[in-house]
C-alpha cells in the first residue's frame, strides 16, 4: 500500500498527463498533440507538481522516472529507470493527450504499471500540471540539455 503522499504525487502526475490530452483534443491551431502547448495555469501546475516530487523529479530519476524530455519520448525508455513490463510494452509516446488520458487513472490506462496513483479527477488540474511540465521542459534552468 502506498502512503497518502505517494498516492497524491501519483494523482498529480496523472492529472498533468490528462490535462495535456484534453488540450490536444480540443485545442485550436494546427499544432500536433506532441508540440501544442496546453492552455493551463503553469503557476498552479507547479504547485500541484510539488506533490509529485515525492516520487518524481524533473531532471533525475527518483522513485519514478524523470520528467525532463517527457514529451515525444516513448513510455518506459528513460535510461537507468526500472519500468514495469506493462509500461515498456504500452506503445505510448508521451504527448499532452496521452499524458492527460494516463493521468485520469494510470492503473486503468496501463494495467500493470508500478505507478500507484489513483489519478486526477479535475481536468483543470491535469491541464495545469501538463502546462507546467511543458514549460519546464522548455526551460534550460529546469531541464538542462544532456
What do the PLM-derived regions correspond to, one by one?
Residues 21-24:
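C-terminal motif of bacterial Sec signal peptides marking the signal peptidase cleavage site
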Residues 45, 49-58, 129, 133:
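The canonical Cys-X-X-Cys-His
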Residues 16-19:
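Short, linear, compositionally biased motifs with a strong N-terminal bias
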Residues 95-144:
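C-terminal capping alpha-helices of c-type cytochrome domains
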Residues 42-46, 57, 61-95, 116-117:
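Gly/Gly-Pro-rich "capping" loops immediately C-terminal to redox-active cysteine motifs
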Residues 26-48, 144-146:
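Electrostatic cytochrome c docking/interface patches
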Residues 2-14:
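Bacterial N-terminal signal peptides that target proteins for export
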Residues 9-11, 26, 53-56, 144:
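Secreted/luminal cysteine- and crosslink-motif detector
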Amino acid at each position: 500500500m502506498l502512503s497518502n503522499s505517494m498516492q497524491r504525487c501519483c494523482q498529480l502526475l496523472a492529472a498533468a498527463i490528462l490535462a495535456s490530452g484534453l488540450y490536444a483534443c480540443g485545442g485550436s491551431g494546427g499544432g500536433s498533440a506532441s508540440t501544442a502547448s496546453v492552455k493551463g495555469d503553469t503557476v498552479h501546475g507547479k504547485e500541484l507538481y510539488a506533490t509529485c516530487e515525492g516520487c518524481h523529479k524533473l531532471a533525475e530519476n527518483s522513485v519514478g522516472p524523470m520528467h525532463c524530455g517527457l514529451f515525444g519520448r516513448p513510455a518506459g525508455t528513460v535510461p537507468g529507470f526500472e519500468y514495469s513490463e506493462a509500461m515498456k510494452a504500452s506503445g505510448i509516446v508521451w504527448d499532452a493527450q496521452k499524458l492527460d488520458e494516463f493521468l485520469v487513472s494510470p492503473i486503468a490506462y496501463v494495467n500493470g504499471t508500478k505507478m500507484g496513483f489513483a489519478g486526477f479527477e479535475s481536468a483543470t488540474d491535469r491541464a495545469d500540471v501538463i502546462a507546467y511540465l511543458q514549460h519546464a521542459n522548455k526551460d534550460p534552468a529546469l531541464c538542462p540539455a544532456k
